[in-house]
């Protein structure tokens, strides 16, 4: 699973996902990409599941770039705990994704292989996405 090596602070506010993505919304490395159409938190497990699905489907051909990184800690309180007594401890990491953000890129394969691999990765995501070609 992806997670930061170290962070300045252990816990973060939840924040808001307003507007569209102004950074990371163009294809930079590969020829094909998966683009988010909705705002969401994508967990490190979901990112890894999508990456594995793409890698398995493409087999040894091509190269895959993961364009998002889970850098936001999500805290959870233990089950059956009374209210108060502070914020819960960090449980997992998420990447904050806004509409327009590129999630994965792929290159070095034909379009139909890329489309199939990226559609498998898209099925692992909790949001609507689209396949784009540079």
Curated annotation (Swiss-Prot):
<keyword id="KW-0150">Chloroplast</keyword>
<dbReference type="GO" id="GO:0032543">
    <property type="term" value="P:mitochondrial translation"/>
</dbReference>
<dbReference type="InterPro" id="IPR036920">
    <property type="entry name" value="Ribosomal_uL16_sf"/>
</dbReference>
<dbReference type="GO" id="GO:0019843">
    <property type="term" value="F:rRNA binding"/>
</dbReference>
<dbReference type="GO" id="GO:0009507">
    <property type="term" value="C:chloroplast"/>
</dbReference>
<feature type="region of interest" description="Disordered">
    <location>
        <begin position="1"/>
        <end position="22"/>
    </location>
</feature>
<dbReference type="InterPro" id="IPR020798">
    <property type="entry name" value="Ribosomal_uL16_CS"/>
</dbReference>
<dbReference type="InterPro" id="IPR047873">
    <property type="entry name" value="Ribosomal_uL16"/>
</dbReference>
<comment type="subunit">
    <text>Part of the 50S ribosomal subunit.</text>
</comment>
<keyword id="KW-0687">Ribonucleoprotein</keyword>
<keyword id="KW-0934">Plastid</keyword>
<dbReference type="Pfam" id="PF00252">
    <property type="entry name" value="Ribosomal_L16"/>
</dbReference>
<dbReference type="GO" id="GO:0005762">
    <property type="term" value="C:mitochondrial large ribosomal subunit"/>
</dbReference>
<dbReference type="InterPro" id="IPR016180">
    <property type="entry name" value="Ribosomal_uL16_dom"/>
</dbReference>
<keyword id="KW-0689">Ribosomal protein</keyword>
<dbReference type="GO" id="GO:0003735">
    <property type="term" value="F:structural constituent of ribosome"/>
</dbReference>
<comment type="similarity">
    <text>Belongs to the universal ribosomal protein uL16 family.</text>
</comment>
<dbReference type="InterPro" id="IPR000114">
    <property type="entry name" value="Ribosomal_uL16_bact-type"/>
</dbReference>
<protein>
    <recommendedName>
        <fullName>Large ribosomal subunit protein uL16c</fullName>
    </recommendedName>
</protein>
């Amino acid at each position: 699973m992806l997670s930061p090596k170290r962070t300045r602070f252990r816990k973060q506010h939840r924040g808001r996902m307003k507007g569209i993505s102004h950074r990371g919304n163009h294809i930079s490395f590969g020829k094909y990409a998966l683009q988010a159409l909705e705002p969401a938190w994508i967990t490190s497990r979901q990112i890894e599941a999508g990456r594995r699905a793409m890698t398995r489907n493409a087999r040894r051909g091509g190269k895959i770039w993961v364009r998002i990184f889970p850098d936001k800690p999500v805290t959870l309180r233990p089950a059956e705990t009374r209210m108060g007594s502070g914020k819960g401890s960090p449980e997992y990491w998420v990447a904050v994704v806004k509409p327009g953000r590129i999630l994965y890129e792929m290159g070095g394969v034909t379009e139909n292989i890329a489309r199939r691999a990226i559609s498998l990765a898209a099925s692992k995501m909790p949001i609507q996405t689209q396949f784009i070609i540079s």
